[in-house]
Regions:
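Extended, charge-rich, solvent-exposed interface segments
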Residues: 308-311
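Nucleic-acid 5′ end/cap handling module spanning
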Residues: 2-51, 103, 107, 120-121, ...
Length: 311
């Protein structure tokens, strides 16, 4: 079994020029990434880092049914685990439930596997995809039709083929479906470029568009980075307000290399200043407090403000 990474998306708003020609929009799920490798009828599950994970007994049983229905033996699926009740709970609650179950030792029940990409087994083993997304989507649709064709006889409640929201060339549909995701309290959408191949790394062939909010927060501290950012700014500590109480959290994404050097050597340029931070949502943390999910530095220091504003 090769050591591998799954395909990871770059951010659409940083690479909007990459969307040319036909593309497919699907929902961005907020769960636990899971890759499935099927060879000679044997089913194995792997994390996004390519590590073997076990215990998904319900999904494995449904996958065995799918193998018989679709006459499969050698295939690679990529997808996301969500809670079985995900349609009736918030994205944040779904994420909490899924990660808790996925990290449980032994059997892991109560999850649904949403499959959003597929490769032939030899493509996976050689780590080289030969099929454009438009063809891979056709394969997924075939599996979806196979599942639906026997739905009255054989139930597969723990497997779902992620549906297409839009396919075409109209880029205005990106904001349309992003706004719908926001209104439905979803995390965002994914843009699959129809003429691109699956890559086992972060790539512009797949782009994510998240629903984000803005807040003007106070910078109260800085911290050093790790790895390539040793001796540079790793991020900032910001204060925000929730339910009339003040909380703190780290923000390490969005800084340019120049900013990381400058702000680490000259922290007073940003300390005690108000800056605009983007984030997905406010969520509870393990310390019974609150934090910001996916906070991102926007390069905007608000010299016209001195107070925190969550609006």
């Amino acid at each position: 079994m090769p050591v591998f990474d799954v395909q990871l998306a770059n951010k659409y708003f940083e690479h909007p020029e990459k969307v040319t020609g036909s593309f497919t929009i699907t929902e961005k799920l907020d769960g636990f990434r899971l890759a499935t490798v099927i060879h000679n009828g044997e089913i194995k599950f792997y994390s996004r880092q390519g590590q073997l994970v076990e215990g998904f007994v319900e999904i494995e049983e449904d996958m065995k049914k799918l193998l018989k229905i679709a006459s499969l033996s050698d295939i690679f699926f990529d997808g996301e685990l969500v809670d079985m009740d995900c349609e009736n709970i918030s994205s944040d609650e779904n994420y909490k439930r899924v990660t808790k179950i996925a990290r449980t030792k032994g059997e892991k029940r109560g999850l649904k596997y949403n499959i959003f990409d597929v490769l032939y087994y030899d493509e996976f083993v050689n780590q080289k995809c030969k099929s454009k997304y438009v063809y891979r989507r056709t394969l997924l649709n075939m599996f979806d039709n196979a599942i639906k064709s026997v739905n009255n006889i054989i139930k597969l409640p723990h497997i779902n083929i992620l549906p297409v929201l839009y396919n075409g060339t109209d880029k205005s549909m990106i904001m349309k479906y992003l706004n719908e995701a926001r209104d439905n309290h979803k995390e965002g959408i994914m843009i699959n470029l129809d003429d691109k191949l699956y890559e086992f790394k972060r790539t512009n062939n797949l782009l994510k568009v998240k629903v984000m909010q803005d807040a003007d927060l106070k910078i109260v501290d800085v911290y050093e980075g790790t790895g390539k950012n040793i001796g540079k700014l790793g991020g900032i500590i910001v204060e925000f307000i929730h339910n009339n109480s003040t909380y703190r959290c780290e923000c390490g994404s969005g800084f340019s290399d120049e900013e990381r050097v400058d702000y680490w050597n000259n922290p007073n340029k940003i300390l005690r200043k108000i800056a605009t931070i983007q984030y997905f949502k406010i969520s509870k943390n393990d310390n019974r407090g609150y934090g910001l999910r996916f906070p991102v530095w926007t390069h905007r220091i608000r010299n016209d403000k001195s107070e925190i504003s969550m609006n």
